[in-house]
């Protein structure tokens, strides 16, 4: 009998501790936050590096595992009477052929199988401009989309779909959620007439406004796409109002202890900032590419102060089941993608790695810019005239090239991964002084991230002395003429005007190249960059491009 009573007692204790009834909220209110960021179209499984999973490799991640995990946590917490919130911190677009072909359509369809409660836009959501974003916003109608530091008054269709903040009305508490995207997003993508401002200032203003709208709100979460370093600044500047920051953009690994994956953590999960006001601000991020699902339960007191917390990111390895609804919904998309991408468009006899393109001349960049030149005329024109083209100079920023090419056949999917942004290849007149300024700007990054703007080129020969001060590093610069015979060079004349070719993103001032936006004249659109690349591959394969002295670096 004593054994039976003891067993019943333990059972009752188990029920009480695993079924958090509403009275628990009289002392502490638990809230579970599930979060993802920088998904980058990893609908399918990947290898541990986030690349397509090949035979023999360990396959992890994929949307089916992510959404299985989200659904499972929600159900488990409901049984305990713990409320939950599913947050997406942006950059769902771009990164695989699934997005290149399916764009907003596949992204919204599959995300809506278990839509986030709240989402902020990342910079890559703007990769195809306002026209590429609006259908996504219209289809994500079950998700609150928040961006407080964006002024959309000049883009009214966007303004209809995005708020600075939202108030999530749960059973036991109302929770304010404010969104911010990296302030420099116009330099990273095509944002149309949208304007952006400082993240912290926008958060403080939104916090005041949401409390006016609902004075009962004393828990505020920021969902950000600004990077971990900026998140820490936000915690410092807004910590009197903000309790939790759910971040993205920097693909940061936060984990307490040894993580289950191969990544090395940058800091604990969560990162804790003790604000002078007495608030404890928790900062979290869940790596990228569907490798992890963030899982944090926070316990708040009656005043909305963080008392304690528990949880860790969940690794999406093979132990995690895959959601059947997601797998079924992916089947027609996979068939379409396979049909479009398995066509052979060229061949390279050498590997063409992308990694070095951010700091030195690379063969991949030579191939890419040569294809841009070919879109406006080739050297074969010298057979019938005294000039071979109207635009003998081309350049592209390293950040435009998103994948390496490997020795062997080049599939359409390979070209698509290399050149996914569908910018126009444009020619325009540019003063020599501004051409030189663009090259100086490309060789003056302030940090590793800014190396994406390093220019690869065709029709230019430049020598940089990197020991000299920024914006004064060019020691020699020659430009190709359009006069036959092909490939003649002369010294740059800063007072002369040159006809150059670049992606439309650069010509529009993207990545900070404001001189191209402000001084370009007689702009001529030719074709999409991917089409220019494929046409060149078909014409000249097999290829064996190499570094050939277009860029010389002196240290």
Swiss-Prot record:
Domain of life of the native organism: Eukaryota
Top enzyme category: hydrolase
Protein EC: 3.6.1.5
Gene Ontology biological process terms, A to Z: AMP catabolic process; suppression of platelet aggregation in another organism
Binding positions for a divalent metal cation 2 per the UniProt entry: 38, 91, 123, 225, 249
Record's keyword annotation contains Secreted: yes
Signal peptide: 1-25
Main function: Facilitates hematophagy by inhibiting ADP-dependent platelet aggregation and promoting disaggregation of ADP-stimulated platelets in the host. Cleaves adenosine triphosphate (ATP) and adenosine diphosphate (ADP) to adenosine monophosphate (AMP) and inorganic phosphate. Interacts with fibrinogen receptor integrin alpha-IIb/beta-3 (ITGA2B/ITGB3).
Residues carrying sugar: 105, 198, 295, 465
Binding positions for AMP per the UniProt entry: 358, 402, 421, 505, 511
Name used for this protein in its record: 5'-nucleotidase-related protein
Keywords tagged on the record: Glycoprotein, Hemostasis impairing toxin, Hydrolase, Metal-binding, Nucleotide-binding, Platelet aggregation inhibiting toxin, Secreted, Signal, Toxin, Zinc
Tissues where this protein is expressed: Salivary gland (at protein level). Saliva (at protein level).
Binding positions (a divalent metal cation 1): 38, 40, 91
Cofactor(s) the protein requires to work: Mg(2+); Mn(2+)
Main location: secreted
Residues marked Transition state stabilizer (site): 124, 127
Effect of disrupting the coding gene: RNAi-mediated knockdown results in reduced feeding capacities: smaller blood meals and longer times to complete blood feeding. Decreased ATPase and ADPase activities in saliva. Reduced ability of saliva to inhibit ADP-induced thrombocyte aggregation. Reduced ability of saliva to disaggregate ADP-triggered platelets.
């Amino acid at each position: 009998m004593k054994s039976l009573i003891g067993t019943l007692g333990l059972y009752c204790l188990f029920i009480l501790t695993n079924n958090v009834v509403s009275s628990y909220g009289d002392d502490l209110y638990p809230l579970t936050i599930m979060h993802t960021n920088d998904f980058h179209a990893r609908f399918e499984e990947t290898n541990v590096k986030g690349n397509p999973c090949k035979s023999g490799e360990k396959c992890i991640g994929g949307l089916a595992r992510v959404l299985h995990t989200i659904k499972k946590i929600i159900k488990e917490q409901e049984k305990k009477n713990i409320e939950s919130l599913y947050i997406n911190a942006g950059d769902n677009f771009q990164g695989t052929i699934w997005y290149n072909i399916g764009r907003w359509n596949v992204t919204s369809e599959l995300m809506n199988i278990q839509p986030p409660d709240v989402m902020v836009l990342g910079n890559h959501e703007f990769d195809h401009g306002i026209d590429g974003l609006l259908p996504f916003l219209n289809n994500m109608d079950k998700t609150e989309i928040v961006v407080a530091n964006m002024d959309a008054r000049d883009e009214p269709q966007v303004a209809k779909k995005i708020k600075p903040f939202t108030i999530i009305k749960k059973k036991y508490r109302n929770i304010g959620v404010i969104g911010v995207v990296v302030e420099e997003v116009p330099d990273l993508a095509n944002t149309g007439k949208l304007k952006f401002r400082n993240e912290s200032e926008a958060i403080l203003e939104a916090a005041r406004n949401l409390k006016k709208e609902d004075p009962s709100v004393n828990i505020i979460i920021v969902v950000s796409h600004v990077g971990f370093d900026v998140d820490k600044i936000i915690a410092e500047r807004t910590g009197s109002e903000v309790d939790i920051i759910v971040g993205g953009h920097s693909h940061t690994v936060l984990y307490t202890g040894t993580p289950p994956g191969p990544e090395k953590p940058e800091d604990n999960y969560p990162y804790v900032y003790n604000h002078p006001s007495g608030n404890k601000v928790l900062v979290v991020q869940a790596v990228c590419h569907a490798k992890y699902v963030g899982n944090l339960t926070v316990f708040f007191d009656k005043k909305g102060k963080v008392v304690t917390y528990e949880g860790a990111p969940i690794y999406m390895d093979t132990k995690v089941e895959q959601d059947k609804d997601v797998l079924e919904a992916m089947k027609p998309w996979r068939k379409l993608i396979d049909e479009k991408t398995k066509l052979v468009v060229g061949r390279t006899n050498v590997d063409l790695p992308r990694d070095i393109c951010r700091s030195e001349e690379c063969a991949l960049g030579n191939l890419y810019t040569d294809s841009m030149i070919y879109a406006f005329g080739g050297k074969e024109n010298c057979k019938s005239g005294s000039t071979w083209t109207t635009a003998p100079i081309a350049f592209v920023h390293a950040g435009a090239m998103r994948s390496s090419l490997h020795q062997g056949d080049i599939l359409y999917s390979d070209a698509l991964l290399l050149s996914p942004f569908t910018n126009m290849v444009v020619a325009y007149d540019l003063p020599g002084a501004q051409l030189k300024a663009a090259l100086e700007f490309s060789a003056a990054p302030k940090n590793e991230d800014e190396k994406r703007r390093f220019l690869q080129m065709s029709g230019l020969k430049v020598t940089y002395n990197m020991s000299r001060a920024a914006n004064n590093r060019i020691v020699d610069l020659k430009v190709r003429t359009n006069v036959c015979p092909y490939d003649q060079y002369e010294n740059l004349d800063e007072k002369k005007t040159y006809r150059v070719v670049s992606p439309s993103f650069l010509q529009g001032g993207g990545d900070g190249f404001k001189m191209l936006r402000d001084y370009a004249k007689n702009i001529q659109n030719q074709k999409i960059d991917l089409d220019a690349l494929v046409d060149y591959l078909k014409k000249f394969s097999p290829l064996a491009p190499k570094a050939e002295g277009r860029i010389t670096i002196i240290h």
